[in-house]
Amino acid sequence: MKKILTVCVAAFLLVGCDDLFTPAIENNKQVSDGLNDPLYSEGILANAYTRNPYNSQSFNDVATDDAVTNQTSNSYLKMATGSWTSNNNPMDQWGSCKAAIHYINLFLAQVDQVSWANDPIVNKMFCDRLKGEAYGLRAMFNFYMLQAHAGYTEDGHLMGVPIVEEVETETSNFNYPRNAFDECIQAIYDDVQKAEDLLPLDYENISSDSEVPETYRSEGANYSQYNIVFGNNFRTRMSGRIALAFRAKAALLAASPAFADGSNATWAEAADYNGEILDLIGGVAGLAANGNTWYKNADEINNLTGGSNPPEMLWRNGKDATAYSLEQAQFPPSLYGSGQINPTQNLVDAFPMANGYPISDAASGYDAQNPYTNRDPRLNLYIVVNGTTMGTDGKTIDTSADNTSNNDGLNRENGYSTRTGYYLRKHLREDVYLSSTTTSGQPHYSPRIRYTEIFLNYAEAANEAWGPTGTGTHGYSAYDVIKAIRQRAGIKDENGNDPYLESIKTDQTKMRELIRNERRLELCFEGFRFWDLRRWDLNLNEPAKGVRISGGTYQVFDVESRTYNDFMRFGPIPYSEVVKFDALEQNVGWK
């Protein structure tokens, strides 16, 4: 079958009556038309790029113990409170990722036949780069499918997703069985290796012929030709570094408790793959000093040009020059926002004291009647608590139940006020101005992969593989990474030390708990908690809690239950797919 790709064009004017009865010129193209139209062929690959689930923020933290929402129609709210089924799945990646892989396979089937440039050397480089992008993207989409849909079947086998690497036609057998989980991990690794062989680590202009890779220099390529294909203009595309990051993410998933028994993966392998990326930036010394405030580093954001990355970003979305929609959705009502995402008391309690001790530790100095005093500075960066000042006018936010002067108080107005006593602060630029009559936006971008994630991946895997202070071949340990992250956050006692970290540095179990908690804090509201709880085999049903502040007292209360069945540690295969294809086994527990 010749795959038909249709472009719909709307006609706004009718010139004459005859036009009504004249057949319109068809604007349909065959895939094969791309052989002489490189822009069209590249558009097939571009279709896959548009399906990256991290092209925008989802705030699926609402489906965890870290947040609730005041939007009653929110799909994650419904999911967390009993409405998650195999045909109603807000976390589904099956349809979009399979479609992306289909387009990638179409592209790979013809990329070698397309005339990308008149110059044969430039043509070869374009062909290599685009193939490398396709392999890297296929690895990425298989990772996201695996994360969302891998699981144990009724016969006790850990299964992944069908591995599809050929073009599907009308004669294809679509009734594929699922591949084993470890086969899917290997397929990701294989595609990453192909991408690494074809792509530069990063897209950067070079200034001399001696810098041209030998593969192309031996064929006569000069630096000017190289820059046309592999230069700065392509910085936002799949690169060797990005592909390696998806191998590292897949390795961590495979080594995690929920998957380890059926994956043949090791923590050492996960540590090495993540460490390989960190070694490229100098290890712990490469931790960006302002990486934990990436969303509000105004000068850094405002000056981003040409796909360049801040030190914290391994891969990011494009910059929106004058945005304010996030602030409209998340600012408290007194700042003309809708306060949609409400962090929980559960998450607030996870932030330690400024001296580094958990608030449950007797040495912490925590005062339940002054709960926000002397806390980890990240609490005030990421969450609006009672008494926070924010916005262009430095407004004090009153989240108490006693507040009758505006709708910032607890449960004052449905759809606008906080349900937990807290509002979201992370992601927001407080130099955005909103009012009833005018708005003034500011540049924003969102991350796809932060280096902090890779550091935390490494710390988790290194602790499991070699203990808290073991370094493997990388020269730095889980302890070293966590120490650097907490120092960046401002964790220190009166002597500038981190006594809690020092007290647990030889205890693998306590270090594991600390690493998981640091991951929870550093990556909150970035789409990690939902998946982390599952791969760690932790309790999915911690009630989401809030705080009622009245008369100067703080009363913690249950805001919303979580009603996940135990089998919901693994997501479902879509019901529509299981019904159509009897070779496709459903994960245990799902219908």
Question: What are these regions, as identified by a protein language model?
Answer:
Residues 58-74, 150-165, 201-242, 256-341, ...:
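Short, surface-exposed recognition loops and adjoining beta-strand edges that mediate ligand/DNA contacts
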Residues 366-451:
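Flexible, polar/acidic helix-loop-strand segments at domain edges
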Residues 37, 42-43, 50, 74-151, ...:
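Conserved, well-structured interaction surfaces
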Residues 17-18, 97-100, 182, 187-189, ...:
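Long, intrinsically disordered, low-complexity segments
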Residues 138-139, 247-249, 443-492:
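Extended amphipathic alpha-helical segments enriched in small hydrophobics
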Residues 17-63, 88, 114, 351-373, ...:
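Membrane-proximal, proline-rich intrinsically disordered regions
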